[in-house]
């Protein structure tokens, strides 16, 4: 009996920590090697439109500051030569910085794929342990009082679709964009932030109407009383 209880707990622990360990090991073992290879062997620089615009803006700002300083102090030709060298070094530094961001995106994307494969394999290979965990969760929820259940549902809905939820959605979607290598786009993110809470609110109300009203009408009454 103890062995049967230990195996699902081990499975749950591996679900939580194994993807994190794989991600950490992958970044530590291959991160520095990929950065070195990219900066020494890669002749082509991969920049999207937003990155190119950012680099150009920084270079233009650097040039404008120098030209303003030159107009005030009237530097000789030798200083102008140093300025051109400085512009060249600044350009290389900016490109390396953006390439490092791109490499970081590739590493994040690769580790996300690996973690997804691991979790998918777990779900197919250990159905029995997953069934036991599911039964434990259902039993735990069933033993809670209707008041605690209603309070938990109210807290969860306020976090996901409440007044302050757009800030959390914005952080989560921005993190998703960064991990999977998409260019940051404020318009798309704003559209998703304004759409997702509405979709989840609709799904949640449908779930209350179809499931909770049939399974536990008293829970629905308590929930509506708290919500009002």
Swiss-Prot record:
Database matches in InterPro entries: CemA (IPR004282)
Bilayer-spanning residue ranges: 6-26, 113-133, 188-208
Function comment: Contributes to K(+)/H(+) antiport activity by supporting proton efflux to control proton extrusion and homeostasis in chloroplasts in a light-dependent manner to modulate photosynthesis. Prevents excessive induction of non-photochemical quenching (NPQ) under continuous-light conditions. Indirectly promotes efficient inorganic carbon uptake into chloroplasts.
UniProt keyword annotation of Repeat present: no
Name used for this protein in its record: Potassium/proton antiporter CemA
One GO term (biological process): potassium ion transport
Keyword Nucleotide-binding: no
Family (UniProt): Belongs to the CemA family.
Organism, as annotated: Populus trichocarpa (Western balsam poplar)
Localization (cell): Plastid, Chloroplast inner membrane
A cellular component annotation (GO) from this entry: chloroplast inner membrane
A GO term, aspect molecular function: antiporter activity
Keyword annotations of the record: Antiport, Chloroplast, Hydrogen ion transport, Ion transport, Membrane, Plastid, Plastid inner membrane, Potassium, Potassium transport, Transmembrane, Transmembrane helix, Transport
Main location: plastid
Reactions catalysed, as given in the entry: K(+)(in) + H(+)(out) = K(+)(out) + H(+)(in)
Entry membrane topology: Multi-pass membrane protein
């Amino acid at each position: 009996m103890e062995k049967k209880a230990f195996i699902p707990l081990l499975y749950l622990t591996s679900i939580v920590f194994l993807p994190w360990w794989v991600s950490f090991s992958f970044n530590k073992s291959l991160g520095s090697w990929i950065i070195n290879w990219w900066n020494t062997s890669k002749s082509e620089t991969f920049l999207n439109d937003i990155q190119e615009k950012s680099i150009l803006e920084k270079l233009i700002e650097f040039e404008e500051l120098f030209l303003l300083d030159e107009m005030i102090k009237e530097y000789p030709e030798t200083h102008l030569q140093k300025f051109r060298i400085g512009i060249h070094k600044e350009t290389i530094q900016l490109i390396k910085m953006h390439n490092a961001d791109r490499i970081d995106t590739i590493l994040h994307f690769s580790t996300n794929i690996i973690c997804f494969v691991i979790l998918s394999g777990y779900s197919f290979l250990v159905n029995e342990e997953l069934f036991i965990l599911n039964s434990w969760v259902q039993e735990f929820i069933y033993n809670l009082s209707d008041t605690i259940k209603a309070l938990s549902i109210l807290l969860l809905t306020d976090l996901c679709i409440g007044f302050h939820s757009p800030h959390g959605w914005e952080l989560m979607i921005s993190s998703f964009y960064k991990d999977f290598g998409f260019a940051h786009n404020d318009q798309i993110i704003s559209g998703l932030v304004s759409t997702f809470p509405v979709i989840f609110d609709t799904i949640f109300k449908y779930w209350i109407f179809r499931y909770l009203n049939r399974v536990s009408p008293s829970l629905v009454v308590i929930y509506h009383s708290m919500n009002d």
